[in-house]
Amino acid sequence: MVFRRYVEVGRVAYISFGPHAGKLVAIVDVIDQNRALVDGPCTRVRRQAMPFKCMQLTDFILKFPHSARQKYVRKAWEKADINTKWAATRWAKKIDARERKAKMTDFDRFKVMKAKKMRNRIIKTEVKKLQRAAILKASPKKAAVAKAAIAAAAAAAAAKAKVPAKKATGPGKKAAGQKAPAQKAAGQKAAPPAKGQKGQKTPAQKAPAPKAAGKKA
């Protein structure tokens, strides 16, 4: 694009840094190649000399004579409705967004993150719907294949949903059946031990008894 933002009388400029940073002014006169006489009657900037390196030229131009007084500048400013036009530009919106982002807290950033995730999820689902609709419209063969795939996916999802319920009932029955042997085992432990078990447990005690009987004989 051709550059059209020239330094001229009536050009509205944005002050990028300095004591009046963030405000708009109108160039009333050009002093030299480095400075200009500016005035901002509607932005509370007094008429003063300002270097060009502090200003960024905008697309707005006011119509008033060379070195006009403040009342003429104010009248032209209000007639052109510069403040509302400036607020509607991308430039002003980006500056406002940057300032709001700098003032955000951790909780605000967390809410923005969750909102972005939700937005991306909604966009993804809508894109998938549009893709499926496009496939169905493209060719009948692909439409049939797509319908079969959708049906298979639905059946698989239904099967997965039913399998855990069956598994849950199966182990429950087995567990109920296993409770009876556990009770029997407890009953066996409570009963007194048999004599044969005593002899098996203490073979060393009965071994010296026969030796003693042989000596007595």
Swiss-Prot record:
Q: What is its main location?
A: cytoplasm
TM segment ranges = none
Q: Where is this region: 4 X 5 AA tandem repeats of Q-K-A-[APS]-X?
A: 173-192
Q: Any idea which residues bear N6-acetyllysine here?
A: K79, K85
- A GO CC annotation given for this chain: postsynapse
Q: Please cite one Gene Ontology biological process associated with this protein.
A: translation at presynapse
Q: Where is this region: 2 X 3 AA tandem repeats of K-G-Q?
A: 195-200
Give the coiled coil ranges.
Answer: none
Q: Where is this region: Disordered?
A: 162-217
sequence repeats by residue range: 173-177, 178-182, 183-187, 188-192, 195-197, 198-200
Q: Is the keyword Disulfide bond in the record?
A: no
What is the role of this chain?
Component of the large ribosomal subunit. The ribosome is a large ribonucleoprotein complex responsible for the synthesis of proteins in the cell.
Quaternary structure and interacting proteins, as annotated: Component of the large ribosomal subunit.
Q: Which PANTHER family does the UniProt record give?
A: 60S RIBOSOMAL PROTEIN L14, LARGE RIBOSOMAL SUBUNIT PROTEIN EL14
Can you say what this protein is called?
A: Large ribosomal subunit protein eL14
> What's the source species for this entry?
Mus musculus (Mouse)
Gene name per UniProt:
Rpl14
